Amino acid sequence: LHVRSRRQRQMCIRDRPVIGWLVAGAGTLFIERGQRHAVHAMGESMQARFKLGDAVGLFPEGTTSEGFDLRPFHASLFEPARSAAIEIQPVALRFLKNGERSGFAAFVGEETLVANLWKVMGSTGLSVEVVFLPALAAKHADGTLPTRLELSHQARDAIRAVL
């Protein structure tokens, strides 16, 4: 089984020189932050990708952080997978510097993307642990679909438990 992965990113990334072209070429789906209609459009794009057999990766916090705790998840981003009855695979990312959890590589605050990339590429001892957690069931035992809020809470709780 070959699954092409697509990721959801903010629209502002699309406009970045070089980076925008690279991520768009990889099949990234972009969302306009702060636009209510954007969630619906993103859902339609995700549904179309599911029909092609693609997996869609998303970052449901909707922003970046230092990675020591989770911000609330946007439950609406879970709706396309929920309505298509597709299992959701929570994945936790743990960033390490010299073997210890670290926020060093975080792209937060007033730091520019270029400054962050320069800092990360010029550093040593950085690594990322990718932890694949048990998939969330697409349906309850009685055949009903979980709500998007249930799915977002289950995913967040599973990820938080390993951070």
How would you describe each model-predicted region?
Residues L1-R9, I13:
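Single conserved hydrophobic/aromatic residue that forms the stacking wall/gate
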